[in-house]
Structure formats: C-alpha cells, structure tokens
Amino acid sequence: MDLAGLLKSQFLCHLVFCYVFIASGLIINTIQLFTLLLWPINKQLFRKINCRLSYCISSQLVMLLEWWSGTECTIFTDPRAYLKYGKENAIVVLNHKFEIDFLCGWSLSERFGLLGGSKVLAKKELAYVPIIGWMWYFTEMVFCSRKWEQDRKTVATSLQHLRDYPEKYFFLIHCEGTRFTEKKHEISMQVARAKGLPRLKHHLLPRTKGFAITVRSLRNVVSAVYDCTLNFRNNENPTLLGVLNGKKYHADLYVRRIPLEDIPEDDDECSAWLHKLYQEKDAFQEEYYRTGTFPETPMVPPRRPWTLVNWLFWASLVLYPFFQFLVSMIRSGSSLTLASFILVFFVASVGVRWMIGVTEIDKGSAYGNSGSKQKLND
C-alpha cells in the first residue's frame, strides 16, 4: 500500500469526513427549516433554494466516491441518447445489488448536473433520519410505507406535486424494492414460479405497482425512462467502507433511453412491460459476467469539480472552530475536559461505524426476506 492509500485508511481521516458531514448537514438542515417561511409566499423559490442546499449535502458523499476513492464509472449507451442526458426529466431504473449502487446513481446525476434536484422513492422511516432524511423531506422526496393500500394515494399525491418542479431531475427508483441477497432471491423466484414468470438469475422480481404509478403520475413531465444496469469489473465487491478507505472501484453502467410514450398507459400492460424489462436486464448482466462488457459505446462523462469545491468550503468552515476548541481544551489540562473529549471521540467512532453498517448487505432491510402474500399481490 502506498503512502496515500495508508493515509486514506486511517480512522482519523474517517472521523474528519464524518464530522464535516454531520456539522455541515445540521447547519444546512437548520437553514432548510427557515426556508419553510418561503413556501406560502413563493413555492418555486423555496424549491430552487432547497435544491441547492440539498446539493451541499449529497455532493459530499459523491465527492468521496469520485475524488477520495477515485472510482471510475464508464457508461455504455447509444451516443444519440447520450446527448439528451441532463437536458430532460427522466425516471432512472437501477438494479439494487451493490452496497454503493445508490452512490453510483447519485454520481450519474452529478455528472449530468442534476444531483441537487434528483428524487428517489424511499421508505418513509428515512424521512426522520437527521441530515439525509431531513434533506429529502425539504426537497419533496417521495416516501412510501411499502404497504400498497397506504401508498396508493400518498405516493400518487407526492408525485403529482413534482409535475411543476422548476428544476430538471432524475427520479431514481429501485423496482426490486430491496437489495439483492441470495435468500431474498430464492423467495422472489418462488413468487415468480407461482406467477408463471421466467426465472431471473441476477435480479429480484420487480415490484410493478410503484413503477406503474410513477409513470402514470409523471407522464408528459418526464421524457424517458433510463434503464440502468450496474456492475463492477473483475468481480469487485464495492462497499462504503472501501470507498471511505480510498479504495478505487471500476463501475460499468449500461444505460438505455426508452421514450415514455413507448411505455403502456394501462397498469397491467405497464406491469408486463416492466417484467420484460427485467428479463432483458438479467440477460445483459449474464452477458457482462461472460464477456466483461456491456453493449453499446463506452463513454466516461467528465468529473465535475463542484463536489470537491463544496466539501472544501464546508470543511474550512466547520473544522477551523473545531480545532480551535480542541487546542483550548488540551491547553486547559483539565482531566474532566480530556475525559469528555475521549467520550466524544468514542461516540463519534461508534457513529461512523453505524453509518457504514446500515449500508452493508448482510445488515440490510428484511423487506423481501419473508414471503409471499404481499409479493403475489404486487
């Protein structure tokens, strides 16, 4: 390991990233709270401000991926479709197999200048998580309870609110509903057999109702669906801890642009269309494992400097007073003060490990591990 790699793996560096993220995130959340005063006066101004405040938070995680770890992402796509990326609203359908696939989705949004306005379909519990969840709340993310009878109206209402959103955006959705594991895959394929659907080797059975209502609600606002199939070269198994340690990964992303008018308007036909899409995605993954590449022309969108500039700004803003406080604490020589600092250090280290742990596949959501009644209804 070279000197830079050794430095990046040090826990002290991880604590610095964690401190900057938490301190700046709470400051930004506070500013977002005050922007609520704008909502009844000028809703579009509220949205534009929060779009940029959101970028200040989410771009810090993208910075870790693109600048700290140096992860490279090659896009395989039709050159004619490539010219439209970033210039239109789109629904992005991404497979959900890797611990950092959400970061790769954000990186895709960032490369085309749409990170601040990008949306996700997320479970409603995340709305209560400080920093990320609160940021999502202020940027009108769509939250679901994963119970269709409850989500039918609430998700549709939230999506309708996005029809007059003033910024371009990617709406990222994992139609599988949960991250791929062997156990979830086995259960999912039992459902596929019960429904008479072809077996998928590399994906879970897609949840069609959420996709259908998204397409129906955003029709004539969103121009296309971007079918994105992600994999990593040389059987790399990327993790957030690896990114934090500065490990470089090599992502390949196959992107197909499908005009929204090509997707059926009828819900049942739309569901059948999505199942066919996932059968095609599965074939693309199988071909990737066989040949090491995707179809179409490989392209590397340029890495933009703004994620790094944003992090350096917030780091200089919050680290200077912290180090001043730390120096004054050490100079005081008080055993109680030093004990308090050690306690804070310990709590921070536990916090860092917890934040990393929630992204790990073996500690992921239990959704999809049980059974069948709900899946048969999807």
Curated annotation (Swiss-Prot):
**What SMART domains has UniProt attached to this entry?**
PlsC
> What broad class describes the main subcellular location of this protein?
endoplasmic reticulum
Q: Which cystines does this chain contain?
A: none
Q: Does the keyword Transferase apply?
A: yes
List, in alphabetical order, the GO biological process terms annotated in this UniProt record: CDP-diacylglycerol biosynthetic process
Q: Which UniProt keywords apply?
A: Acyltransferase, Endoplasmic reticulum, Lipid biosynthesis, Lipid metabolism, Membrane, Phospholipid biosynthesis, Phospholipid metabolism, Transferase, Transmembrane, Transmembrane helix
Catalyzed reactions per annotation: a 1-acyl-sn-glycero-3-phosphate + an acyl-CoA = a 1,2-diacyl-sn-glycero-3-phosphate + CoA; (4Z,7Z,10Z,13Z,16Z,19Z)-docosahexaenoyl-CoA + 1-hexadecanoyl-sn-glycero-3-phosphate = 1-hexadecanoyl-2-(4Z,7Z,10Z,13Z,16Z,19Z-docosahexaenoyl)-sn-glycero-3-phosphate + CoA; 1-octadecanoyl-sn-glycero-3-phosphate + (9Z,12Z)-octadecadienoyl-CoA = 1-octadecanoyl-2-(9Z,12Z-octadecadienoyl)-sn-glycero-3-phosphate + CoA; 1-octadecanoyl-sn-glycero-3-phosphate + (4Z,7Z,10Z,13Z,16Z,19Z)-docosahexaenoyl-CoA = 1-octadecanoyl-2-(4Z,7Z,10Z,13Z,16Z,19Z-docosahexaenoyl)-sn-glycero-3-phosphate + CoA
- Span-the-membrane segments of this chain are 11-31, 125-145, 307-327, 338-358
Motif HXXXXD motif, residue numbers: 96-101
PANTHER family this protein is in? 1-ACYL-SN-GLYCEROL-3-PHOSPHATE ACYLTRANSFERASE DELTA, 1-ACYLGLYCEROL-3-PHOSPHATE ACYLTRANSFERASE-RELATED
Q: What is known of its domains?
A: The HXXXXD motif is essential for acyltransferase activity and may constitute the binding site for the phosphate moiety of the glycerol-3-phosphate.
Query: What name is this protein filed under?
Result: 1-acyl-sn-glycerol-3-phosphate acyltransferase delta
Q: Which species expresses this protein natively?
A: Pongo abelii (Sumatran orangutan)
Q: Which gene encodes it?
A: AGPAT4
